[in-house]
Amino acid sequence: MARIRKSDQVIILAGKDKGKRGTVLRVLDDGHLVVEGVNRVKKHQKPNPMRNIQGGIVEKEMPIDASNVALFNPATQKADRVGSKVLEDGRKVRVFKSNGEMVDAQG
């Protein structure tokens, strides 16, 4: 089970954006995440009239390693580690290590 999923709130633990909070936009297969508003870089975009792309300098989010982020726990307002737990009905859910609450509200 993935510890961090799309649309999770995370806190950056290391790097130039340390301490920032953001939402996960994409989870890549190689263990990297794209987080909203974090690790923004300026890329030079070539114009492409076929795809209706205007050229220029574009600012976009680049992937960050999953080991440099931690899930945000709204109950404690801090970064928290994540574990998994099997419920009585057989479902496997993610839980916060600090207080044992479920990460997903719907379970």
Curated annotation (Swiss-Prot):
Write down the InterPro entries for this protein, in alphabetical order. KOW (IPR005824), Rib_uL2_dom2 (IPR014722), Ribosomal_uL24 (IPR003256), Ribosomal_uL24_KOW (IPR041988), Translation_prot_SH3-like_sf (IPR008991)
Q: GO CC: one term?
A: ribosome
**GO process terms (BP):** translation
What keywords sit in the KW lines?
Ribonucleoprotein, Ribosomal protein, RNA-binding, rRNA-binding
Superkingdom to which the source organism belongs: Bacteria
> Which is a Pfam family this sequence falls into?
KOW
Q: Does the entry feature the keyword rRNA processing, yes or no?
A: no
Give the Gene Ontology MF terms in alphabetical order: rRNA binding; structural constituent of ribosome
Looking up Gene3D superfamilies in the UniProt record yields: 2.30.30.30
Family assignment from sequence similarity = Belongs to the universal ribosomal protein uL24 family.
- Please give the function described in this protein's UniProt entry: One of two assembly initiator proteins, it binds directly to the 5'-end of the 23S rRNA, where it nucleates assembly of the 50S subunit. One of the proteins that surrounds the polypeptide exit tunnel on the outside of the subunit.
The subunit field of the Swiss-Prot or TrEMBL record says: Part of the 50S ribosomal subunit.
> What protein name does the entry list?
Large ribosomal subunit protein uL24
Write down the species: Thiobacillus denitrificans (strain ATCC 25259 / T1)
